[in-house]
Amino acid sequence: MQQLEVISILKKDLNFNERSIEKLKKFVELVLNENKNHNLIAKSTESSIWHRHILDSAQLVKFIDFKLASLADLGSGAGFPGLVIEIFNKNKDFHVKLFEKSPVKKQFLSKVIKELDLGAEVYGDVRNEVLDADIIVCRAFKKLERVIQVSREIAK
């Protein structure tokens, strides 16, 4: 599935607006550029980034109640799914919290947030943070048992 097909799905089925699509395009550009120097995503998935990473992350917006206060993305890595959700987010009172222990990835996440003028916040290793969240998401973070354990510790 190519970029244009994914964008069509994002607009029609998931209600992404044109502003969000433009931010996603810039986000993809930033990920691919940074991936030349640091392993943010597997090189083998670069050509399928729109389907494998963007659409896979974006499908979560159907299940998120943006009237709640916050969402935590555990092991955010390159920002999937947290930054995709933040790009979609239209509620200024809804906060996306990105948890990432890698200093390189934390720096990248902060750069994306600044360049795209997003409201997400970056935190360090989830084990060292005392934060709460209404919704917890993750993608390729840990084994399910560990995800549940960490979720219990930070969920409201």
Predicted regions and their residues:
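Conserved beta-strand elements of the Class I
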Residues: 72-74, 135
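Short, charge-rich binding segments
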Residues: 63-65, 87-91
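Acidic, metal-associated active-site segment
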Residues: 57, 80-83
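S-adenosylmethionine
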Residues: 82-84, 91-156
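Class I SAM-dependent transferase core
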Residues: 2-68, 72, 104-118
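Class I SAM-dependent methyltransferase "Motif I" SAM/SAH-binding loop
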Residues: 75-79
